Amino acid sequence: LFGFLIKLIPSLFGALSNIGRNRNQ
């Protein structure tokens, strides 16, 4: 379970950063 969270959390942050970049552009 923890391994899944460790893989899931970075992907969520990546998605949020991508959304922020799209808004800036």
UniProtKB/Swiss-Prot annotation:
The keyword Secreted applies. Keywords: Antibiotic, Antimicrobial, Cytolysis, Hemolysis, Secreted, Toxin. One of its GO terms (cellular component) is extracellular region. Its main location: secreted. One of its GO terms (biological process) is defense response to bacterium. It is found in: Secreted. GO terms for molecular function: toxin activity. Expressed by the skin glands. It comes from the Eukaryota. Thanks to its abundant amphiphilic alpha-helices, it may integrate into membrane phospholipids, leading to lysis of the membrane. Its hemolytic activity is inhibited by phospholipids, but not by cholesterol. Has antibacterial activity with a broad spectrum against various species of bacteria including both Gram-positive and Gram-negative groups. Also has ichthyotoxic activity. Belongs to the grammistin family. Group 1 subfamily. Exists as aggregates of 3-4 molecules. This is Grammistin Gs F. It comes from Grammistes sexlineatus (Goldenstriped soapfish).
